[in-house]
Amino acid sequence: GGGHFLHSRFNDVMDWVFEHSPRSEWNKFQAKVLIDLEGSPVEFPIELNLWQLPTDQQVEYLYSYLTASKKDIEYKNFEDWIRNYLGDKIADNYMIPYNKKLWCIDPSTLNTDWLIKIPNTNAKLVLKTIIEKNSNFTEEVVSHRSFYYPKEGGFQTMFNSIYEHIKDRVVLGYKTKKLEYDSQNKIWIIDDKYRTKNIINTAPWPVLDVHLNGFNFKKEFEKLKYLSDVISLWEREPYDHKAQWKYIPNPDIEQHREFYIHNYAPYSKPGGVMTDINSIRWRQHNKKWKAGVPLYEHENVYSYPMPTTDYKEAIKNILFYCRDYNLFGLGRWGQWQYFNTDQCIKQVLDFFNSDDIKKFDFFKTF
C-alpha cells in the first residue's frame, strides 16, 4: 500500500515492476514539491532549499539548522529528532505543525523507526546549496527526486498490469474475516471455507479474527494504532506552476497536503486537485470544507500505521509467534510499517528470495 507515484532506490523493485508494466507505458518526471513555509513557497527538501527564502529568513533558518546539527545525542522520539537534527525554526514552522495535522497527535508520542523516509542530508550539503543557490541533490538524498507515472489510467494501472499475470490465482472482491489454525492437521482454515498450510497477510491485523493456540491477538492489536484520512477531488482554475504536490503546515488550512494532478497526468483536466486531510480534522470541521469545486470524497479508514512509541513490541510479538505456524505478515499492514509501494514490493521480493522464510528479518529497516 501507499505511494501515489513510482520511485525507488531499489533496482530490483523497478526491474520487477517494469517486467509486469512496461517502462514505455510510463512518463518520467523530475519531482517539484513545494512547502508552504510562513506564506512562502519553498521546495522540498526544506533544508536544501533554504536559499529560496528571503535573506533575513535564510540566516535565521540556517543558523538554527547548523547549531542543532552539531548536537550529538540519542533521539528519544520524533520531536526530539526534529529539533536536534533540523533545528527549532524548521521544527516550529514546518515539521511539528505539519505532523500534528497529519497524525493529529503530539509528535513526541511517535518513534523514529520510520525515518528511512526522511531526506539524508548533512551540514556540508546544506551550506553548498546556500552558496550555489541550487538544491542539486540526487536520489541518494531523496528517493523521489524523480518518479514515474502511468501515461494513462492513473496509478491503479500498475496493479491492473500485475493482476493480468496472475488473475487465474486471484479471488477479487472477497473480504477475509477469520483465520483459524487446526493444530492437529497443521493447516489454516480461512472463514471456514479455504484450507492452506501457509498464509501471507497484507491486511491490517485488527480487521482479522485470528485463532491460534489461545494467543491473545486482541491485546496486541490494541497497541496497533492507525491513521484514517479523507481523499477529495476538486476543480480549480488551471494552475500556473509545475509543482506536483505541496505540504501545508498552516493549521488554519484544513488539508495537510494537496496534489496538482494535471502536472503529472497531463491527460487529466487542467485545474484538478486532490487533497488529503486527517479524518479527525475532517470531523472537527463537520465534514464541510472547501478547496475548490467539490467532485469526489472518500474516507480511507486504514491509511497509515502510526509509528507510536509502543507499537513495535506488539507487532514483533505477532510476527514472531505467527511465523512458527506459517502465518506471515508482509507490507505496510502486515509488518505495520510506514512503507510506500516500492518498499512493500521490496519486502516481498526479499521474503521469497530468502534461504529460510522462517528467519526472514521483518525489521531490517529499523
Regions from the PLM with identified roles:
Residues 1-71, 120:
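Dinucleotide-binding Rossmann-like beta1-alpha1 core, especially the glycine-rich loop
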Residues 16-17, 210-212, 339-340:
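Short glycine-/acidic-enriched loop or helix-start segments at secondary-structure transitions
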Residues 21, 146, 218-222:
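Short, P/G- and charge-enriched loop/turn segments at secondary-structure junctions
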Residues 27, 169-173, 296-297, 328:
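General small-molecule cofactor/ligand-binding pocket signal
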Residues 36, 171, 189-191:
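A general beta-strand register signal
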Residues 40, 58-182, 194, 202:
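Active-site/ligand-binding neighborhood in enzyme catalytic cores
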Residues 45-46, 257-366:
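Conserved flavin/dinucleotide-binding core of flavoenzymes
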Residues 175-290, 296, 314-321:
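Mid-domain catalytic core of redox enzymes
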